[in-house]
Regions:
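Conserved beta-strand-loop surface patch within small alpha/beta domains used
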Residues: 1-65, 71-104
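Extended, compositionally biased flexible segments
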Residues: 58-74, 205-206, 210-221
Length: 247
């Protein structure tokens, strides 16, 4: 654990049961923690920073992360957190249950423009799992890899922690591998429950849609991560809710 991380945890303990807040600042000497005062009217439920604190942190160096805590709460960013994180364009570090959970500033999961290898179905899959607290590797994937003798999804699911489950046992957060104009599975979607899936297909924005007969026919297999727990879908759901109210 770094000195910065130790300072973050100590500040969160001092502030509890109120939420702590602050910044990680990079200077020529290295990274350090810049604690702020939570001026929220309900500090046990929300945090708010004074503009003066933000300016003071910027004067110290480059702000590289925003930090706050969820005392007694959940280790995922809330709906409000995600909305504000996207606006801030910063990584957010969340203190919860004595640990620091670090979230990259990924775009909202819905409404993304498709670009193969940059913002495609695997990017959506990876970013959704990141928000749920599970890290997935990024890897190069050439155009039309499924037509060039590669089977990237099936070759990598087990090595990245997934195991296959029966389609009849689908739970929110499971990953559907589909054959989209291909004889091998070349498309991933996240099952959201209630007959809905979240995915990103070429020439469309990423979206939630019904798991219709069309997609059921295209489904090759269903996979679940060994570290998955049902509550982890909260991290994904909160982003979907934030995006639906984002203005």
């Amino acid at each position: 654990m770094t000195e910065t991380e130790s300072a973050i945890l100590a500040h969160a303990r001092r502030c509890a049961p109120a939420e702590s807040c602050g910044f990680v600042v990079r200077t020529p000497e290295g990274e350090s923690y810049f604690p702020c005062v939570n001026i929220s009217g309900e500090p046990a439920a929300y945090f708010r920073m004074a503009p003066e604190d933000w300016l003071s942190a910027e004067m110290q160096g480059e702000i590289v992360a925003l930090v706050h805590s969820h005392p007694g709460g959940l280790p995922w960013l809330s709906e409000a957190d995600r909305r504000l994180q996207v606006q801030s364009d910063l990584p957010w570090w969340l203190v919860c249950r004595g640990a620091i959970h670090k979230f990259r500033c990924v775009p909202h999961l819905t409404g993304r423009r498709f670009e193969h290898g940059v913002t495609d179905c695997y990017t959506l899959f990876r970013d959704a799992y990141h928000l749920a607290g599970i890290e997935m590797p990024d890897f190069h994937r050439g155009d039309d890899w499924w037509r060039n003798g590669q089977n990237l999804y099936l070759d990598n699911m087990e090595t990245t922690g997934f195991y296959r489950v029966a389609l009849t046992e689908a739970q929110p957060g499971d990953v559907l591998l589909c054959c989209f104009g291909s004889s091998v599975p070349n498309h991933a979607a996240i099952y959201c429950g209630d007959g809905e899936l979240l995915h990103h297909i070429p020439e469309q924005l990423s979206k939630r849609e019904r798991y219709t007969d069309k997609w059921q026919r295209r489904t090759h297999s269903l996979w679940r991560h060994r570290a998955w727990r049902a509550s982890a879908f909260t991290g994904i759901y909160n982003d979907l809710a934030a995006a639906s109210t984002f203005v």
